[in-house]
Amino acid sequence: TDMPIQVILRKHEGGFVSDRCLRASDLNENLGEKNNPEWKTIVYDNKSKSFVAPNGSIGFRWGEEGKWNLLHQSGGQEIDQELSCLGNQDELVSVGFPHFTPNESDLLWRNVPVRKVKNAKNEEMYVTSVFDLQVANYGIDRGLGGENVAQSYSDSSVAYTPAWAEKITGVKAADIERTGREFADNA
């Protein structure tokens, strides 16, 4: 899964927006990766408490026989890929997510937990996981507060709730909730 992969955030309009995946080539000495470091995505390892290049990214496809796989390893060591840094974050920042509803803001700002890391130029960067970005984009309140977080399914003022969708589509919020639960039950 891509969920633990770290994404660089860049400053935008007083907050941040997602930029691209953090790569070994972004970090000091390519994080020890000599072959294709610009194609090796990075995760945070709970065991070593550090950023690592896990087996399986496209950078391992050529030139490193046996490392293009889905084993939870980096450098021959077992790793535990962190899904979310929530609770261990360095900071909470406001991240803007694209929003395409007419007559509403182009960006929805939501709080996201982040880690700070120094790049190869010794500049501080903010990074977070794909998972943390996706959950924030959905508007799920994980106790982080901030703008655009629904208090309930019936909150029609926050994008993507059933009540909000009912205003746009005409489909009853209760039907949207039921359909969502049925999909979840069958997943």
Residue map of PLM features:
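Long, well-ordered, tryptophan-enriched scaffold segments
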Residues: 1-186
